[in-house]
Amino acid sequence: MKTRFLTQVLSLLLIPGSSLVVAADTSTPSIPKDHVRIECKIKPIDRNSHHRTHPHIPFGEMRIPLGYSTNWSGYVAETNLTNPAANSVSAISASWIVPTIKASTNSTYCAIWVGIDGYSNSTVEQIGTEHDCINKKVQSYAWFEMYPGGSYEINGFPLKAGDVISASVTYTAKNVFTMILSNNTQKVSTTIPTSYTKSTTAKRQSAEWIIEAPYMNSILPLANFGTVYLANCKATINGVSGFINNNAWSNSGIEMITNSNTPKDIPTTLASNGAFAAAWKHQ
């Protein structure tokens, strides 16, 4: 299983095989030179008529190395999982493959993102992609959010099932974050204007790589995405850059479950290049 998983991730995300055993680039993400920079229209998401993402909702006591949540799955990294240091996380990035969503009779939803904060506090600075099935029709779009501030759709950013997406959030200075989203298959990238990415409340305590069941008054049904693959999951914490499982900090997997303990989404163990997969189990 692990060999098959790594083969799929490395081939589909176009990651050199040597990165599995040799230290890879963990520098601050930038737009690839062969990408076309596109300016996308930033469209506010109406909170009263549209779902949104939400900070981590834990279930039961926190457990290490695997915690439980009713709306998140994936991985989190902090200086310390029980008492994380503020102002410690300055960057996060990852790549993932846009999943093929299976149609369902009811409306279902799925968000894939990277972000800073939200696991141990109530702010989140995040960017990612959304994949829903509404009235039996699959819809995908890119978005970002500075929770509890506004949520925004990134209109004009291309997304198709099978595309390889890269995303990053980097703290620059003076409460400003830089957010970059790239479609490596279609070779386009966009940078979110910094007028949208300021936060005076961000604690910068945690880095997260997440598959989420979005929220609108309550947690929404999780779309059947099959398996989501993420790789090159990197962070910079206390000035040290590395993959999720760097020894300079602590990390934990997160399994998404229902209130009755039924697994909804289970992440695999980490590969040495920060790769993991998440398998859908239940709405």
Put a short name on every predicted segment.
Residues 9-17:
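Bacterial N-terminal signal peptides
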Residues 2-9:
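Bacterial N-terminal signal peptides that target proteins for export
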Residues 19-23:
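Sec/Tat signal peptide C-region and signal peptidase I cleavage site
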Residues 24-283:
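Exposed, interaction-prone regions of secreted/extracellular proteins
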